[in-house]
């Protein structure tokens, strides 16, 4: 059966404990695979504690005296391909705390969503699936995408009934208008994925642009992204997005929201609803505009906080 995640990632937030939980999960996965069977409930509990390598780059650095044992252990445990992928993920693989995920689902319930076709386009091991409310899960079909092989294999053991693809979102071939909800924590950075249909977007904007197209009319996109999506002075992407979706609201998370995952990146949770028809008129587009703000944190800041409300509870949306 699918695994329900009840323990927070905070249980293993210390770097050494996180490393140990990850290695134990990988050893368990490899044993399961070598025996050509599915995970038991007890093994699923072990696998569910895998939380990626974000924040523990020292384990991949041979010059770190205090991490030499771990460095050698990983070189022995992982294949060359797995090792390279894990090392590269130390700056990008930050998993989402269950309390944040549950708040997003509460907001979706308040918006009237009771179940349907749900996609997580950057699923990790599937925390968004594991925290799906039971009643919503009964009426839903789950689809996930995960680039990293080890992570995707763990996700498949945790959620065998979900349809999970081990590839980048840019290599998926979902039909437009497929999903009722697209939810997740998208990667962010200063690089562009290769996708001829969406070749002008940085990675975080790319996930928004493609996700909107994959939603059914009236479908909802609830994504965690870097503050840059709403803060950047160039509003061309927000303007493009406004032609396809209504901005339902957003919450700026505290800087320490992902501290236990190893990062303090400023992030927003943004909710959009796909329009029935593109470029509908008579809608409030104030959220698209950005204004120059001179302050300690940033030169540019998008919109007013009547649209992006700092630290408010998602249940208010």
Question: What are these model-derived regions, one by one?
Answer:
Residues 141, 163, 246-249:
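Conserved beta-strand segments of alpha/beta enzyme cores
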Residues 200-256, 269:
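Conserved Class I SAM-dependent methyltransferase catalytic core
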Residues 2-13, 307, 312-317:
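Single conserved hydrophobic/aromatic residue that forms the stacking wall/gate
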Residues 11, 15-158:
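Class I S-adenosyl-L-methionine
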Residues 102-111, 117-132, 167-197, 210-214, ...:
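Conserved proline-anchored active-site loop of SAM-dependent methyltransferases
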Residues 259-309, 315:
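Flexible, glycine-/basic-rich loop-and-beta segments that form/coincide
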Residues 156-172:
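S-adenosyl-L-methionine
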